Regions:
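Covalent nucleotidyltransferase
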Residues: 38-162
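RNA/tRNA-interacting regions in translation and RNA-turnover enzymes
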Residues: 1-69
Length: 162
């Protein structure tokens, strides 16, 4: 399921699970020529979701209640995904009500901003991230998927079922 060794993940992030960001599908040029795109879009087999101009993050509330916010970027030091929950204490507090063993996928974004504005907050140390948010406004977390809830994982379920 994951390219990240569980023992290494547990060493750095007790109670967490870690996985790569899902790859998103799009039609190749050959497929576009073969199929009527409007028919594919309207056939009921696919759905779209709003894309915010931010950055992908997975929120993990571990089995022991530990909270993590993993980006899709890997640390050069550990080879694991970078963790940024301390940059967004308001989001950590808002998600505290979720049961242990929950994993959400979403996008951290600056309302009215772009992905560079998001990186200005999420790419720095926590104290600077909090300072920037106090000055410029808080980032939001747009949740678009739930891949685990209360210890039950849904990785093998399709998007419609989740």
């Amino acid at each position: 399921m994951s390219k990240y060794p569980l023992d290494l993940v547990q060493q750095y992030y007790p109670g967490a699970i870690m996985f790569e960001a899902q790859k998103y599908w799009s039609m190749s040029e050959d497929q576009k020529k073969k199929y009527n795109v409007a028919e594919v879009v309207d056939n009921g087999k696919y759905f779209g979701q709003l894309k915010k101009d931010g950055n992908w993050y997975a929120f993990v509330k571990g089995i022991g209640g530990q909270k993590y916010l993993f980006s899709r970027n890997e640390s050069k030091k550990t080879g694991l995904l970078t963790e940024r929950i301390e940059n967004v204490p308001h989001i950590e507090k808002a998600l505290d009500c979720l049961p242990n063993g929950t994993v959400l996928i979403g996008e951290i974004y600056v309302p009215g901003g772009d992905s560079n504005a998001t990186r200005q907050v999420m790419g720095c140390l926590p104290a600077k991230a909090i300072e920037r948010q106090k000055e410029d406004g808080y980032v939001h977390y747009y949740i678009f998927d739930c891949v685990a809830y209360d210890g039950k994982t849904f990785f093998d379920s399709g998007s419609w079922q989740r």
